Curated annotation (Swiss-Prot):
Species of provenance: Sulfolobus acidocaldarius (strain ATCC 33909 / DSM 639 / JCM 8929 / NBRC 15157 / NCIMB 11770)
Superkingdom of the source species: Archaea
Enzyme class, first EC level, given as a word: lyase
PANTHER family, sorted: PTERIN-4-ALPHA-CARBINOLAMINE DEHYDRATASE
A GO BP annotation: tetrahydrobiopterin biosynthetic process
Name of the molecule in the record: Putative pterin-4-alpha-carbinolamine dehydratase
GO function term, MF aspect, one: 4-alpha-hydroxytetrahydrobiopterin dehydratase activity
Matches recorded under InterPro entries: PCD_sf (IPR036428), Pterin_deHydtase (IPR001533)
Keyword Hydrolase annotated: no
Length: 91
């Protein structure tokens, strides 16, 4: 079930470093180089597969930008918060 904007903003404190923009949770992770950026994405893959919930992402030389939303619900759901928490534990 899609969470309303007030609920999302209230819960942002649960997921350090994430923001709420354009109906998505968003975070930029910074790294030393491209290799570290790609390794980070590789660590996300099994978590996303296990949850059957995959982030939108952009990989740059020394950073990865992640956006989370549940397309079938048209916005942010509990599943997005759960995935954000798991991703935060990687780094």
């Amino acid at each position: 079930m899609k969470l309303d904007e007030n609920e999302i903003k209230r819960r942002l404190g649960e997921i350090e470093g994430w923001s709420y923009e354009n109906n998505k949770l968003k975070k930029t992770f910074k790294f030393k180089n491209f290799y570290e950026s790609v390794e980070f994405v590789r660590k996300i893959q099994p978590i996303a597969d296990e949850m059957d919930h995959h982030p939108d992402l952009c990989v740059y030389y020394n950073r990865v930008v992640l956006e989370l939303s549940t397309h079938s619900e048209g916005g942010v759901t509990e599943k997005d918060f759960e995935l954000a928490k798991k991703i935060n534990k990687i780094q």
